[in-house]
Amino acid sequence: MDWTALRAAAVEAASHAYAPYSRLHVGAAALVVDGRLLQACNGENASYGRGLCAEWGLVPQLHSPGGGRLVAMACRSGDGELLMPCGRCRQLLWEQGGPELLIDSPRGPVPMTEVLPDAFGARDLPA
């Protein structure tokens, strides 16, 4: 796993962010189990609550060519600062990568079980 390249891809993605309100440019980069590298950025609009986090932009890219599973993800600001996913995005990442998905964190790469302990998932839904 080349975390340096993944982090650089996240910074590059942040350069494309549309963030005229918060001015927080966010980029996410993820590695798929089949080797694909995905990149996405955040996008805001004037009705503040309807913006999209960078991590959400990864999902259509993952599933459009046929799916897969995320195995590693890094999130960075436009200045290269490490950013952790918000709570909503942590749930999304759990769905797309499961407990083994590695997330870049201040302590280095950690599994989703540390980022979202006791996660809610499909097993919690009625059969």
Region annotations inferred by a language model:
Residues D2-H16, P65-A127:
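C-terminal binding/interaction regions
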Residues R7, E55-V59:
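A general structural signal for well-ordered alpha-helical segments in protein cores
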Residues Y18-Y21:
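Short Gly/Pro-enriched turn/cap motifs at secondary-structure boundaries
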Residues L31-V33, N42-G43:
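Histidine- and/or cysteine-centered catalytic micro-motif in compact active-site loops
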Residues L62:
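Active-site catalytic pocket residues across diverse enzymes, especially alpha/beta-hydrolases
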